[in-house]
Amino acid sequence: REGGMAGSYLYQDPEAKYDYIADVFDTLIVRDIRQKYKIRNPILMNRIVDFLMDNISNLTSARNIADALTGNKDKINHKTVGNYMQYLCNAFAFYRVRRYDIQGKKYLASSDKLYLSDHTFRYAKLGTKNLDYGRVLENIVAIELLRRGYEVYVGVLYKKEIDFVAIKRNEKLYIQVSDNISDEKTFEREVNPLLQIKDAYPKLVLARIRDEAYQYEGVQIIDIADWLAEQPSTSQK
């Protein structure tokens, strides 16, 4: 919930801290977008922001958002939604991650994921509404991979999703992210798609295991806090 906003650490009171963070987002990002692109429907912009924050780590598209936000009276144009989404990405409020067909080695055009640049923006704006720690952790890992210089994609293999395919020059990582893998079914759900990948690049499951890293049939199981704290090169061993 703390995020990476340096100025927020000046505030001891949690409510004051999150008010500050929300104000930073509204002032430096949303207001700047409104002025730069001469937004004619600021209410729609705010609704799109809230929708994207509420659906971090979910596949989405401009058309899906337009359909979800369209009420009984007003029809929302998906092209307008797409423009607003692009403006938010241009302002680095969100990062767009495309889907990649691992077997076919091609990019997929339909539905991307948009990750929030700092997950604490979501908490400051929406509180604990629909809070899913698995999706929050996935968002954190996406931003960290980008920070480490990887090109990041959502992997698709035999209609199953690999959370991340991370590529940097001749390096490649396949990563699954989960809040808790103590349940056997959850563990299998996260590991099995990785086991179906036939190449020799590293395959990781990042989860809150609170234990030493270990391997399962060649898949590295790593505590997500340890992975975030380590030097980037160590994740490739």
Residues of each region from the PLM?
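Accessory nucleic acid-recognition modules appended to NTPase machines
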Residues: 9-172
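Nucleic-acid nuclease catalytic cores
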Residues: 157, 198-218
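Short active-site-adjacent structural elements
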Residues: 162, 183-186, 212-216
